[in-house]
Amino acid sequence: MELDLIGGFKMPLAGGTLDVGLTWYMYPGGADNTDFAEPYVKLSGTAGPVNLLAGVAFAPKQEALGNFSNTPQSNGQSKHNLYLWGDASAGIPGTPVTAKAHIGYSDGNPGLGPNGTSVAPTGEYFDWMLGLDYVLGPVTLGAAYVDTDITNAEAAYLQPNFSSTKDGSSIASGKVLFSVTAAF
């Protein structure tokens, strides 16, 4: 299980919004030294009918981000992680549908950390998403295609930790995701 605690501050800036904060990633019941902190900065605004967001998150060197391979060299190793991303969304006129897109880049530990997990399992990779949201009152139905540029060979190196099912299929390949979100 992952529990994310987020604290930050938002303020208007040049017609947009600046959001500065910290995410603390916690893994209750996980191996020692799995929790880590990641400061972030996000700038959001609009360009015509399009909502835009750009962000950077940098987790400084921490043991939770190190390469844990059961070798003397990896014992107590600390690594950093950098994540850059951009999001765009726009409502489709005359409909309750919003089109959305995301692109991200991660640079960090080229291996698995505690609990066999990693925020950048291949050292660096790109991720992207294209999707649609359909609003029905307080409920939003979503469908999105998500993918990475992690190759099959890189994903195989990370098995079985990066498996989506018991048959060993990779979580790094493209998938269609469906979501239901309720706002109160």
Protein language model regions, located:
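An amphipathic alpha-helical core segment
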Residues: 118-119, 128-131
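Hydrophobic, well-structured mid-protein blocks that either form specific transmembrane helices
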Residues: 25-83
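Transmembrane beta-strands of outer-membrane beta-barrel pores
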Residues: 11-13, 24-28, 45-49, 56-62, ...
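Membrane-embedded beta-strand positions of outer-membrane beta-barrel proteins
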Residues: 7, 20-22, 41, 52-56, ...
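Outer-membrane beta-barrel "beta-signal"
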Residues: 134-137, 168-184
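Outer-membrane beta-barrel translocator domains and adjoining extracellular loop/strand segments
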Residues: 1, 30-37, 64-75, 106-123, ...
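Surface-exposed loop and membrane-interface regions of Gram-negative outer-membrane beta-barrel proteins
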Residues: 1-15, 19-35, 114, 121, ...
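Residues that define the transmembrane beta-barrel architecture of outer-membrane proteins
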Residues: 1-3, 16, 33-39, 78-84, ...
